[in-house]
């Protein structure tokens, strides 16, 4: 199973894809191992700890106790004490689950001080010795039903009854429109249009020099509507519990957020390609607020309908309010520290009175920043600061007053994970233990820092999306009489909302937008207008920046055409500048920047074996090069022993080296990240005495029309058109 080109090379699925750090599980935790997958045991072992068998709904016993106007069932396991009005099949499932629990280890009873406003609780089970980051971290010990009932005994019932006051169903609520009051005929028409790629689009401008493209299924009688801006959280349809706290932490929206929030909270898909250090926290708070709002509304709808069914056991009510499994929100993140930041947003917005296993979470997910990185760029410190391990997963379960970390996936409301962490539990190497049913009912999928995921192994992200909203292989205690019709009709992927945030957009991210974001409510893409990275070069003297276009008939043929152009045109001039008379080598100081690892291997092998380059001395640094070999290559290049140095984009992404001795730069392809252009060109000025000479050597970059997206970020939106279509010449220079 090969990874995408240039994103880790041809590697097995469980390899990080050449990731340059986190080799020991990131700072702050040991490397996780996966010998005891409790998710996998859900299908094979029949353990009482599975947690996937529900009493005819997505919610378990603890949640049922929180239903308004609903009498609390007994904590006894004796079937004689069961509620007489329950359905026989559901009662049987409860008895079966209780029988299993009876044979398991004794559960520890907890006592909580309900007079305390906030309590952090550590619940240790028989597997707590595995807390150092095993697979069980995302499917950890659950509290027993007896404990959950004990927790609720002292809760005033008037609190339960009034919790949802003011939260009555609103026909104008996007939640009701998108999930509950669904016109099956219109839904089918929209799905048919999407399946035939029948989208109608509208383009407009957004504040901050952003471009908005809104798309909706092209159905008869429906046109695209530009949604009015939303000024603040007071204008959102929030649960009262969230509305009470959101205003304290989310200030009045700026002009950009005001324009995008209506689409986010209106359950439309969003691809936002202008994520920055300054707006990342705001959008993180917004998508966490949206996810919490969705979880609470889903949960309360199920509880209210449970109450109705208990009050009217003989009625023919058809209350379809849930999916096949409980998890409703999936948040995909690049590192454990990014997960910590998301949890900080969730807790400040939800304001739980208790947080179970919070200390364990911080011990295994959080770490201090490396002091040696103080000189690193801000974007580097944001991504790799703290615990930068990229293999993790975490289940979150919400009750009325509690957030439970490390809940079993099938008992969780929200799953936070890295693509690699999810894939390790979804698809075992032996192929015998596969489990992705917990993704069958995801209704909101969020991808943050998608550009960072590209530098890990994008194939893992594609794999996760390919397994979202599939029909489950097992029932997991599902009450099919409560499952929404569009789940049963295998239409869930057309109802799911996907929110993707990235610093820039690439063909891979565009492919995700085109093929996986198929929301019947519509989708929008927000992209910046670029001035060009060539205007922001950190050198005291002007630098000649030359772009050479080569012909390429298709993306498939582009690598071959690029290599042919390099060896026939660029390399010949490189050899002339790197060798003296008679072929004797001389110091050149030429850095060849290569975005793709596969291209790096091809060029390295060519330079080492071709008769054309027999007198050319070179070194090579890739994301797989050892620290010792990196130091040797840098030393030889700086001293002039090597006249050429090969350097990959992913190496720069993970390490941000400052390469000294650079006098001229050849870009085999321009970088995806526009920040890298200025940083790499800045190598020319690391030796002040030779800055003028290096500026004269300048930069030469190769490109084709298939590089349009990243070329736009480098040369600017206005310049790009002529450079791609100019017929009078294929070389463009800027000073």
Swiss-Prot record:
Similarity annotation: Belongs to the UTP25 family.
Gene Ontology terms: cellular component: nucleolus; small-subunit processome
Gene source species: Paracoccidioides brasiliensis (strain Pb18)
Main location: nucleus
Oligomeric and partner information: Component of the ribosomal small subunit (SSU) processome composed of at least 40 protein subunits and snoRNA U3.
Gene3D superfamilies for this protein: P-loop containing nucleotide triphosphate hydrolases (3.40.50.300)
Keywords noted in UniProt: Nucleus, Ribonucleoprotein, Ribosome biogenesis, rRNA processing
Molecular-function annotations in GO: rRNA binding; U3 snoRNA binding
Top-level lineage group: Eukaryota
UniProt feature, compositional bias: Basic residues: 18-30
GO BP, one annotated term: maturation of SSU-rRNA from tricistronic rRNA transcript (SSU-rRNA, 5.8S rRNA, LSU-rRNA)
Ranges where the record places region Disordered: 1-173
Name of the protein described by the UniProt record: U3 small nucleolar RNA-associated protein 25
Composition bias type Basic and acidic residues, residue spans: 38-47, 113-127
Residues in coiled coil: none
Role noted for this protein: DEAD-box RNA helicase-like protein required for pre-18S rRNA processing, specifically at sites A0, A1, and A2.
Positions with biased composition (Acidic residues): 59-69, 138-157
Subcellular localization(s) per the UniProt record: Nucleus, Nucleolus
């Amino acid at each position: 199973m090969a990874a995408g080109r240039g994103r880790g090379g041809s590697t097995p699925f469980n390899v990080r894809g050449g990731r340059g750090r986190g080799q020991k599980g990131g700072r702050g935790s040991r490397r996780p191992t996966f010998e005891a997958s409790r998710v996998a045991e859900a299908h094979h072992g029949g353990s009482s700890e599975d947690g996937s068998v529900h009493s005819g709904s997505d919610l378990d016993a603890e949640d049922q106790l929180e239903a308004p106007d609903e009498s609390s069932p007994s904590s006894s396991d004796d079937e004689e004490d069961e509620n007489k009005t329950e359905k026989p099949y559901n009662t049987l499932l409860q008895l079966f689950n209780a029988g299993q629990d009876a044979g398991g280890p004794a559960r520890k009873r907890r006592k909580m001080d309900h007079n305390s406003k906030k309590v952090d609780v550590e619940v240790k089970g028989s597997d707590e010795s595995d807390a150092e980051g095993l697979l069980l971290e995302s499917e950890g010990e659950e509290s027993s039903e007896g404990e959950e009932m004990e927790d609720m005994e002292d809760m005033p019932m008037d609190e339960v009854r009034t919790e949802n006051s003011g939260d009555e169903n609103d026909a104008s609520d996007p939640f009701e429109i998108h999930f509950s009051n669904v016109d099956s005929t219109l839904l089918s028409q929209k799905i048919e249009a999407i399946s035939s790629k029948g989208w109608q689009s509208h383009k407009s401008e957004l504040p901050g020099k952003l471009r908005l493209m809104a798309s909706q299924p092209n159905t008869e009688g429906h046109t695209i509507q530009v949604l009015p801006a939303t000024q603040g959280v007071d204008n959102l349809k929030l649960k009262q519990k969230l509305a009470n706290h959101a205003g304290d932490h989310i200030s009045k929206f700026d002009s950009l957020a005001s324009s995008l929030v209506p689409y986010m909270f209106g359950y439309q898909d969003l691809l936002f390609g202008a994520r920055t250090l300054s707006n990342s926290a705001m959008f993180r708070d917004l998508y966490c607020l949206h996810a919490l709002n969705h979880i609470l509304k889903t949960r309360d709808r199920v509880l209210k309908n449970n109450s109705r069914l208990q009050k009217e056991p003989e009625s023919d009510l058809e209350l379809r309010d849930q999916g096949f499994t409980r998890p409703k929100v999936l948040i995909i993140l690049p590192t454990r520290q990014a997960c910590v930041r998301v949890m900080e947003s969730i807790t400040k917005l939800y304001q739980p009175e208790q947080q179970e296993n919070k200390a364990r979470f911080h011990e295994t997910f959080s770490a201090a920043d490396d002091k040696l990185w103080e000189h690193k760029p801000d974007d580097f410190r944001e991504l790799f600061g703290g615990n930068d391990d990229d293999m993790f997963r975490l289940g979150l379960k919400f009750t009325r007053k509690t957030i439970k970390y490390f809940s079993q996936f099938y008992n969780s409301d929200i799953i936070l994970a890295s693509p690699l962490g999810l894939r390790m539990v979804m698809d075992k190497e032996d192929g015998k233990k596969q489990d992705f049913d917990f993704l069958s009912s995801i209704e909101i999928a969020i991808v943050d820092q998608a550009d960072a995921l590209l530098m890990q192994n994008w194939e893992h992200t594609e794999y996760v999306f390919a397994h979202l909203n599939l029909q489950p292989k097992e029932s997991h205690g599902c009450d099919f009489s409560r499952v929404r019709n569009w789940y049963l009709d295998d239409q869930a992927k057309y109802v799911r909302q996907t929110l993707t945030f990235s610093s820039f957009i690439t063909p891979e991210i565009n492919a995700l937008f085109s093929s996986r974001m198929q929301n019947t409510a519509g989708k929008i893409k927000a992209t910046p207008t670029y001035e060009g990275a060539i205007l922001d070069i950190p050198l005291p003297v002007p630098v000649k920046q030359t772009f050479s276009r080569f012909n390429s008939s298709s993306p498939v043929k582009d690598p071959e055409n690029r290599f042919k152009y390099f060896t026939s045109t660029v390399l010949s001039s490189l050899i002339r500048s790197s060798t003296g008379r008679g072929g004797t080598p001389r110091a050149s100081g030429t850095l060849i920047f290569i975005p793709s690892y596969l291209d790096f291997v091809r060029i390295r092998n060519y330079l080492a074996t071709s008769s054309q380059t027999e007198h050319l001395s070179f070194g090579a640094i890739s994301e797989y090069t050892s620290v010792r070999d990196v130091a040797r290559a840098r030393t030889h290049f700086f001293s002039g022993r090597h006249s050429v140095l090969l350097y990959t984009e992913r190496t720069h992404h993970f390490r941000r080296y400052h390469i000294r001795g650079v006098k001229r730069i050849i870009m085999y392809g321009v970088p995806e990240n526009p920040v890298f252009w200025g940083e790499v060109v800045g190598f020319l000025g690391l030796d002040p005495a030779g800055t003028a000479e290096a500026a004269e050597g300048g930069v030469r970059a190769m490109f084709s029309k298939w590089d349009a997206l990243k070329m736009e970020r480098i040369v600017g939106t206005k310049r790009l058109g002529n450079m791609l279509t100019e017929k009078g010449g294929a070389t463009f220079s800027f000073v």
